[in-house]
Amino acid sequence: MAAQKIRIRLKAYDHEVIDSSARKIVETVTRTGAQVAGPVPLPTEKNVYCVIRSPHKYKDSREHFEMRTHKRLIDILDPTPKTVDSLMRLDLPAGVDIEIKL
């Protein structure tokens, strides 16, 4: 039988929030006795929106806004039932999107 692996992918707009969440996950996993690989920083996605400043004309005057999406990847190798239970109970901030693949 192949070794089990849980892959957790985190996304957030604030890099400090995502780093603290990744730190919490790694501490929880190591405390329960499973091995962890990561957090691996994935490329930051940058969306730039260009908006005309004036409501009428003056197309030459524009303003740029950007949204940066930071991503992290954590692999949990050989998870125990205690590991899965503690991950389900873990309380993370609302600004972090979590994707879990088994």
UniProtKB/Swiss-Prot annotation:
Residue stretches in coiled coil: none
Top-rank taxon: Bacteria
Protein name: Small ribosomal subunit protein uS10
Biological process, per Gene Ontology: translation
PANTHER family reported for this sequence: 30S RIBOSOMAL PROTEIN S10 FAMILY MEMBER
Cellular component, GO, one term: ribosome
SMART domains registered for this protein in UniProt: Ribosomal_S10
Any one GO molecular function term: tRNA binding
Database matches in HAMAP family: Ribosomal_uS10
Function: Involved in the binding of tRNA to the ribosomes.
Family to which this protein belongs: Belongs to the universal ribosomal protein uS10 family.
Organism for this UniProt entry: Parafrankia sp. (strain EAN1pec)
Subunit structure: Part of the 30S ribosomal subunit.
The entry's keywords: Ribonucleoprotein, Ribosomal protein
A Pfam family per the record: Ribosomal_S10
